[in-house]
């Protein structure tokens, strides 16, 4: 099993969620996050004054999937989250040693 963390632009969340549902993903955790990478933030004009915005709003999607659909999920996220502009985000893939569904005690693939 693998855990996929995807940091994407907030306006792409619905597209990514729907596309992942089409490939069989039935659940995910979504968190509003802030961060910066190469784009380093930007300036905004507010009431006539310029302000530097160091951290940009992003959304973090976390899913745990069986090994055989990792590439499909990663490709789906890339295809639907990509705008071609700086700040599209990142995808991280981690090994998962064990998963337990608290309600039933099911483990591993049965728990995801």
UniProtKB/Swiss-Prot annotation:
Record note on quaternary structure: Homotrimer.
Q: What function does this protein fulfil? A: P-II indirectly controls the transcription of the glutamine synthetase gene (glnA). P-II prevents NR-II-catalyzed conversion of NR-I to NR-I-phosphate, the transcriptional activator of GlnA. When P-II is uridylylated to P-II-UMP, these events are reversed. When the ratio of Gln to 2-ketoglutarate decreases, P-II is uridylylated to P-II-UMP, which causes the deadenylation of glutamine synthetase by GlnE, so activating the enzyme.
Give the matching SUPFAM superfamilies. Answer: GlnB-like
Gene3D superfamilies from the entry? 3.30.70.120
What is this protein's name? Nitrogen regulatory protein P-II 1
Q: Which positions carry O-UMP-tyrosine?
A: 51
Q: What post-translational events are described?
A: Uridylylated/deuridylylated by GlnD.
Q: Which organism is it from?
A: Escherichia coli (strain K12)
Q: Which UniProt keywords apply?
A: Nucleotide-binding, Phosphoprotein, Transcription, Transcription regulation
GO BP annotation list: regulation of fatty acid biosynthetic process; regulation of nitrogen utilization
Q: Which PROSITE patterns match?
A: PII_GLNB_CTER (PS00638), PII_GLNB_DOM (PS51343), PII_GLNB_UMP (PS00496)
Q: Which GO terms describe its molecular function?
A: ATP binding; enzyme activator activity; enzyme regulator activity; identical protein binding; small molecule binding
Cellular component terms per the entry's GO annotation: cytosol
Asked whether the keyword Transcription is assigned, the reply is yes
- State the family named in the UniProt similarity comment for this chain: Belongs to the P(II) protein family.
């Amino acid at each position: 099993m693998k855990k996929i963390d995807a940091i994407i632009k907030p306006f792409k969340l619905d597209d990514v969620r729907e596309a992942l549902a089409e490939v069989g993903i039935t659940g995910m955790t979504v968190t509003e996050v802030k961060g910066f990478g190469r784009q380093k933030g930007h300036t905004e004009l507010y009431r006539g004054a310029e302000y530097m915005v160091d951290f940009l709003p992003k959304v973090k999607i976390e899913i745990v999937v069986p090994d055989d659909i990792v590439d499909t999920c990663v490709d789906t996220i890339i295809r639907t989250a990509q705008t071609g502009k700086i700040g599209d985000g990142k995808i991280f893939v981690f090994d998962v040693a064990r998963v337990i569904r608290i309600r039933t005690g099911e483990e591993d693939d049965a728990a995801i």
